[in-house]
Curated annotation (Swiss-Prot):
Chain ranges passing through the membrane: 68-88, 96-116, 149-169, 298-318, 331-351, 377-397
Name assigned to this protein: Transmembrane protein 135
Record's subcellular location: Mitochondrion membrane; Peroxisome membrane
Bilayer topology annotation: Multi-pass membrane protein
The family this protein is said to belong to: Belongs to the TMEM135 family.
GO cellular component terms, A-Z: cytoplasm; lipid droplet; mitochondrial membrane; mitochondrion; peroxisomal membrane; peroxisome
General function of this protein: Involved in mitochondrial metabolism by regulating the balance between mitochondrial fusion and fission. May act as a regulator of mitochondrial fission that promotes DNM1L-dependent fission through activation of DNM1L. May be involved in peroxisome organization.
Gene name as annotated: Tmem135
Length: 458
């Protein structure tokens, strides 16, 4: 870590807004670029979300535009206020210290910006930025040799997280809202202890299906025969009395779970690749084949499918071994199911789910009266996390997640890469390492230190 007392005499033009010597002009340029990009991000995002949630006409008329503008204002303020505090700190302190170009300027900017955003979105933004900041700090520690990497560490973290999530899922009132609904969709409602699916209702549903198929024409008889054959195979097999999958034996229950979630994962990855595939439809038509026969499609499918099948298989196995259904089974089953991430390794997914788990446990502690409640916790955590990420973007971009760095470049129209990081190398973080010794051309009339590449006025 660079010494906090070390400083350089350069002004804000020489280090920050090297494209223009005026702080006001630079502020306006950053603000306009950030606003333009923010509207491009949030307008389609909110519109798609409104369509998927089947919002009524009143929402589109009175709420959609204000919400888009509010979120766009938040993101714009985050970028514009950063350059503002960057210049203010330099004028107040008279020089740059190791912490001022990044963390010092970003902390107050992020705090003010998050107050503009709607309260309902602050929690999600906080989780995302806390996750990103944790990953950034980890990379910084590895780069400095203070932290040693663990092979398949993201898989181990996911195993622990999955074990805890599945335990809460099995417990009464353990999870609520979207998290509970998502896990119920993934592993099925048969794994919920309070599930009211009785053998009688299962039998009644099967009888209804049979009645329905009786009136089908002859053309459908082959399909009906295949269905009947599959149903008979699924039903006639080992199933423990504690298992609630009444229409399947334990083996077919696991196989069906794998096939279902494999299909979901495969289709999700295909949908994510559709925009890039159609962009090259006329120039490279062969890319359409890669939409369906891509390695990542099968990897995500294998990850989700094996997670469900391992979880269900382990749960059934433990019910057979212990002759009872227990919430503690979910810890073992969830941990073993987490090994499925070997098919689709992702530090981002592991860190995000772990962050959400910490948030869930924190609020459970508040409900139990064992953990104090901090009213401004989300605002403070967001501010500190964003400041850490901005500091990395300025002082050591090699330790920042590449996708977030690209986002910052989009938000500032590429101006974030124009900082004079060569002058920041004195702090020992390798600030210019990824910029191929880039040195900005500066007007010597507005500099404190003689520039290496002065603008030639001749």
């Amino acid at each position: 870590m660079a010494a906090l007392s070390k400083s350089i005499p350069h002004n804000c033009y020489e280090i920050g807004h090297t494209w223009h010597p005026s702080c006001r002009v630079s502020f306006l340029q950053i603000t306009w670029g950030a606003l333009e990009e923010s509207l491009r991000i949030y307008a389609p995002l909110y519109l798609i979300a409104a369509v998927l949630r089947k919002r009524k006409l009143e929402y589109y008329l009175y709420k959609l535009l204000p919400e888009i503008l509010q979120s766009a204002s938040f993101l714009t303020a985050n970028g514009a206020l950063y350059i503002t505090f960057f210049c203010i700190l330099r004028k107040i302190l008279g020089k740059f210290y190791s912490w001022t170009p990044g963390f010092g300027a970003a902390l107050p900017a992020s705090y003010v910006a998050i107050l503009i955003e709607r309260k309902s979105r602050r929690g999600l933004l906080t989780i995302y930025m806390a996750n990103l900041a944790t990953e950034t700090l980890f990379r910084m520690g590895v780069a400095r040799g203070t932290i040693t990497t663990l092979r398949n560490g993201e898989v181990l973290l996911f195993c622990i997280t999955a074990a805890m999530y599945m335990f809460f899922f099995r417990c009464k009132d353990g999870l609520k809202g979207f998290t509970f609904s998502a896990l119920r969709f993934i592993v099925g409602k048969e794994e919920i202890p309070t599930h009211s699916y009785s053998p009688e209702t299962a039998y009644a549903k099967v009888e209804q299906k049979r009645e329905k198929h009786k009136g089908t024409p002859r053309a459908m008889s082959i399909i009906a025969l295949v269905r009947t054959l599959v149903d008979s195979v699924c039903k006639h097999g080992p199933r423990h009395r504690c298992c609630k999958h009444y229409e399947d034996n334990c083996i077919s229950y696991c196989i069906k779970g794998f096939i279902r979630m494999f299909s979901v994962g495969y289709l999700i990855q295909c949908c994510l690749r559709i925009p890039s595939a159609f962009r090259h439809l006329f120039t490279e038509p062969s890319r359409l084949l890669s939409l369906f026969y891509n390695k990542e499609n099968f990897q995500l499918g294998a990850f989700l499918g094996s997670f469900v099948s391992i979880y269900k298989g382990t749960s059934c196995f433990l019910r057979w071994i212990r002759n009872l259904d227990d919430e503690l089974h979910a810890i073992v089953a969830g941990f073993l199911a987490g090994v499925s991430m070997m098919f689709y390794k992702s530090t981002t997914i592991s860190m995000y789910l772990a962050s959400k788990l910490v948030e869930t446990m924190y609020f459970k502690g508040i409900e139990a009266g064992k953990v104090p409640y901090f009213p401004q916790a989300d605002t403070i955590i967001y501010s500190i996390s964003t400041a850490i990420c901005f500091h990395a973007a300025v002082m050591e971009v090699q330790n920042l997640r590449p996708s977030y760095w690209k986002f910052l470049l989009r938000l500032t129209k590429g101006r974030f890469a124009l900082m004079n990081r060569k002058a920041l190398d004195v702090f020992g973080t390798g600030a210019s390492r990824e910029f191929h010794n880039f040195i900005p051309r500066l007007d010597p009339r507005y500099t404190v230190v003689t520039p290496e590449l002065p603008i030639d006025f001749s």
